């Protein structure tokens, strides 16, 4: 830390690279360790927001949540490896182990449940609620899936709504 202000770091190598970043909280081994100028981030758990450099206003709770995030803003990840591969995707919310795991640049997505929106990479404005809802979605946008494995096989189909157990399961 050189000129950063109002930072809190607990845990080995937490906030190690911080230079001018401010209002960050890092709690856990290597949490926010790559942060240089990012600000107003909260990281709780082993390797949370580990690769963040300049991203701000992110919240990561759970081992390796938002691990790959570098410059993205306004993301919330709660659960083991939620939003794990996210780098620049902004304004995403993931709750549940592996939720939005593969997301890289997709924005404005909400995933709640174990592996919900798991394969999403660039798809935007999707909502998935339930165990593996919208699991296979990669690039599709504007989908809503509520229920266990709803829209499970969907990869590129957009503007779909599915509600119930395995609703629109085979839609691609």
Model-derived regions, located:
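Glycine- and small/polar-enriched repetitive beta-structure motifs of secreted/surface proteins
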Residues: 1-172
């Amino acid at each position: 830390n050189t000129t950063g202000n109002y930072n809190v770091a607990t845990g080995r190598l937490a906030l190690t690279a911080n230079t001018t970043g401010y209002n960050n909280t890092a709690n856990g081994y290597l949490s926010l360790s790559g942060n240089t100028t990012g600000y107003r981030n909260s990281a709780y758990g082993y390797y949370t927001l580990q690769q963040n450099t300049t991203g701000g206003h992110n919240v990561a709770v759970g081992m390796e949540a938002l691990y790959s995030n570098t410059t993205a803003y306004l993301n919330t990840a709660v659960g083991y490896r939620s939003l794990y591969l996210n780098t620049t995707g902004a304004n995403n919310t993931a709750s549940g182990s592996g939720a939005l795991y593969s997301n890289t640049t997709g924005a404005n997505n909400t995933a709640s449940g174990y592996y919900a929106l798991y394969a999403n990479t660039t798809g935007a404005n999707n909502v998935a609620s339930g165990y593996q809802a919208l699991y296979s979605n990669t690039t599709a946008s504007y989908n809503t899936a509520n229920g266990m494995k709803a829209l499970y096989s969907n990869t590129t189909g957009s503007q779909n709504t599915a509600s119930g157990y395995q609703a629109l399961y085979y839609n691609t």
